[in-house]
C-alpha cells in the first residue's frame, strides 16, 4: 500500500493512504517521463525543427504497471502553433507520424475512414473534435454520385455529441454507424487532460489503442477501440485542460528551481541586467538539492514529486476544489490546433492532398 508520511509536531507521524487517489492524465508520456525505465515499455525520442517526437510501445506487462492499454503511443511536443511557420512544421510532422501509425496497422490507401469528432462543441476546451472536422474533406457522397479522381479515399465524418446532451452512450452511436457504413478504420479526435502544465495545448498524442471519452476529467464513457468496433481505431488528442493538483504541484517544483537558480547565481552580473520577471530559469541547468527543498517547504519539501501531487489531490478533492483549468486564450489556440489536425488528416489520408492544395 502506498503511504506518504507527513511529520506532525516533534514526535508524531501521521500516515495518509493515497493509493485510492488517481492523478488525471490521458497522456502516456506523463506516466513514464519521470521514470528511468519500466518493464514492458519501450520508448525512443527524436527532435526535428525543435519539435520533440516520442514513440512509446507498451506491452501487456507495461500496461499493468501504468494502467494504460497496450499498443503504440506517439507524442509530438511543440512550443508555439500561433505562428504560421511553426504551425506548418508541426503539421508536417503530424502528417508523417499519422501515416506511420496507419502503416503499422496495415491500413491501405483504399481503406475507407470514419473520422469522429468527440467532445462538446458548446464547450471551448472540449470542442477540439467537432472543430477539427470542420477542416476535414468528406468524399463518400462523391463516390456515390460519380467518379472521384484517383488519390482520394472514401471518408465520412461523425459528431456524436456528448451523453449529457444526447442521452446516448457515445460508443453506442459510433458502433451503430460503423455497423451500417462499414468503414475500414476509425480516427477519433478528442480533447485530453494532462498531468503537466508544460504540455497543455503544446502536445499531440496519437495511439492505435483507441480512447475512453471523458476519462481524463473523470467522466469515463464506453471504450472506443478495435476491441469494441472490430476495426482499427486511431485516437488523436491534445491536452487542453489540467486540474488544480497539477497546477499547484508544478508551481511547487518551479519554486524549488527558481530558488536554487537564484541562490547559485546571486552574484552573476548578467542577471542584474535582466528583470526578474523576464528571466526564464527553466532554460538553465539547475541542480535542486534536498537541502534547498527543506529550507523552502520543510518536511513537504523532502517528498517525491508524485507524493506531493497525491497529497495535494487528497487535500483538494474531498472539498470539490480540484478544478479543471484551461488557458484564457483557448479559443484562439483551438482554431490553430484544429487546423493542424483536420488538414493534417486530409494530407495523411489522401495522396492528392498536400501542403499546397
Where in this protein do the model-derived segments appear?
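Gly/Ser/Thr-rich loops at beta-strand to alpha-helix junctions
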Residues: 118-126, 164, 191-195
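A structural-propensity feature for long, helix-poor, extended segments
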Residues: 150-178
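Glycine-rich phosphate/diphosphate-binding loop of Rossmann-like nucleotide-binding domains
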Residues: 120-153, 157
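N-terminal amphipathic/basic leader segments beginning at the initiator methionine
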Residues: 6-70
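A structural signal for small-residue-enriched, beta-sheet-centric alpha/beta enzyme cores
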Residues: 158-159, 188-356
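Short glycine-rich or small-residue beta-strand-to-loop segments that form or flank ligand, phosphate
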Residues: 75-79, 112-123, 157-161
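Conserved acidic residues
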Residues: 113, 184-185, 233
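Helix-enriched interaction subdomains in cytosolic or periplasmic regions
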Residues: 65-93
Amino acid at each position: 500500500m502506498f503511504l506518504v508520511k507527513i511529520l506532525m509536531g516533534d514526535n508524531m507521524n501521521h500516515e495518509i493512504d493515497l493509493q485510492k487517489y488517481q492523478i488525471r492524465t490521458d497522456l502516456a508520456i506523463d506516466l513514464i517521463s519521470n521514470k528511468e525505465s519500466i518493464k514492458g515499455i519501450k520508448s525512443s525520442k527524436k527532435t526535428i525543427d525543435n519539435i520533440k517526437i516520442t514513440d512509446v510501445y507498451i506491452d501487456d506487462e507495461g500496461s499493468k504497471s501504468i494502467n494504460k492499454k497496450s499498443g503504440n503511443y506517439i507524442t509530438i511536443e511543440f512550443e508555439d502553433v500561433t505562428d504560421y511557420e511553426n504551425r506548418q512544421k508541426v503539421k508536417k510532422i503530424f502528417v508523417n507520424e499519422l501515416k506511420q501509425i496507419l502503416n503499422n496497422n496495415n491500413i491501405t490507401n483504399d481503406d475507407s475512414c470514419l473520422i469522429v469528432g468527440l467532445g462538446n462543441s458548446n464547450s471551448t476546451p472540449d470542442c477540439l473534435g467537432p472543430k477539427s472536422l470542420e477542416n476535414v474533406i468528406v468524399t463518400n457522397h462523391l463516390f456515390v454520385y460519380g467518379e472521384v479522381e484517383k488519390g482520394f479515399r472514401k471518408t465520412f465524418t461523425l459528431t456524436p455529441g456528448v451523453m449529457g446532451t444526447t442521452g446516448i452512450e457515445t460508443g453506442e452511436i459510433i458502433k451503430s454507424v460503423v455497423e451500417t457504413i462499414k468503414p475500414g478504420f476509425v480516427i477519433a479526435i478528442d480533447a485530453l487532460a494532462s498531468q503537466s502544465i508544460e504540455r497543455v495545448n503544446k502536445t499531440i498524442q496519437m495511439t492505435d489503442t483507441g480512447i475512453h471519452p471523458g476519462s481524463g476529467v473523470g467522466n469515463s464513457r464506453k471504450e472506443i477501440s478495435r476491441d469494441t468496433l472490430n476495426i482499427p481505431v486511431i485516437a488523436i488528442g491534445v491536452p487542453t485542460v489540467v486540474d488544480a493538483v497539477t497546477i499547484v504541484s508544478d508551481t511547487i517544483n518551479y519554486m524549488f528551481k527558481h530558488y536554487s537558480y537564484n541562490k547559485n547565481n546571486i552574484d552573476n552580473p548578467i542577471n542584474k541586467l535582466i528583470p526578474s520577471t523576464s528571466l526564464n530559469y527553466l532554460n538553465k541547468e539547475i541542480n535542486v538539492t534536498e537541502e534547498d527543498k527543506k529550507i523552502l517547504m520543510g518536511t513537504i519539501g523532502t517528498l517525491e514529486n508524485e507524493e506531493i501531487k497525491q497529497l495535494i489531490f487528497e487535500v483538494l478533492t474531498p472539498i470539490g476544489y480540484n478544478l479543471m483549468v484551461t488557458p484564457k486564450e483557448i479559443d484562439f489556440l483551438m482554431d490553430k490546433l484544429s487546423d493542424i489536425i483536420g488538414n493534417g488528416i486530409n494530407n495523411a489520408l489522401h495522396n492528392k492532398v498536400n501542403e499546397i492544395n
